[in-house]
Curated annotation (Swiss-Prot):
This toxin has also been classified in the scoloptoxin-02 family. This is U-scoloptoxin(02)-Er1a. One of its GO terms (cellular component) is extracellular region. It comes from the Eukaryota. Expressed by the venom gland.
Amino acid sequence: MIVSLRCCLLLVALLITVETAIMSKRDIVCSVSGDVACNLECELLHKKKGSCDENGACTCFNKKRETE
């Protein structure tokens, strides 16, 4: 009983860790590699341009982005 409870808790902790890593993946891209990696990821996955915003998150946008 105790062993199965430990396994269950370990599995839940692992799932939470993996989910957190997936949810924050874009933030990791910007903090580690910057705009170049963000732009490459957006180009490959979404056929769009990308850049890191002021919050450090990778943001994808259409290639014909207007600059102000």
